[in-house]
Every structure is written in C-alpha cells, then in structure tokens.
C-alpha cells in the first residue's frame, strides 16, 4: 500500500475539507395545509400526499 511521502499541512487539509459540508434538506409547502414537508413524502402535520390521507398509517394503532 502506498504511504504519503510528506506530511499534509493544516492549510491543505482545511482547504480540502472546506467543500465537504452538509446540504440543507429541500422542503416544499403542503398543498393541503401549507406546512413545510419533505418532497415525495406525506405531510407530517396533516398526513396528506398526492390527494390521499395517510394520517392513520402515521399514528400508532394502539394507545394505552
């Protein structure tokens, strides 16, 4: 296996890692209630997706 011949400086390391960053999640407004939701997912506030309500699938079946 190849080994580095010289130590990588802090400046080179930091400049290389400067582009390695997280991107914010894209959100869209729900057409039913207007709350922000992830695209292609059911709305967390009203449970609608593509004209159908999936709220019963989101809530737990049994509550004690």
UniProtKB/Swiss-Prot annotation:
One GO location term (cellular component): large ribosomal subunit
InterPro entries per the UniProt record, alphabetical: Ribosomal_bL32 (IPR002677), Ribosomal_bL32_bact (IPR044957), Ribosomal_zn-bd (IPR011332)
Pfam families linked to this entry: Ribosomal_L32p
Xref: PANTHER family: 50S RIBOSOMAL PROTEIN L32 (PTHR35534), LARGE RIBOSOMAL SUBUNIT PROTEIN BL32 (PTHR35534:SF1)
Sequence similarity: Belongs to the bacterial ribosomal protein bL32 family.
GO biological process annotation, one example: translation
Keywords associated with the record: Ribonucleoprotein, Ribosomal protein
Annotated GO MF terms: structural constituent of ribosome
Name of protein: Large ribosomal subunit protein bL32
Organism: Bifidobacterium longum (strain NCC 2705)
Ribosomal protein among keywords: yes
Superkingdom of origin organism: Bacteria
The keyword Phosphoprotein belongs to this UniProt entry's keyword annotation: no
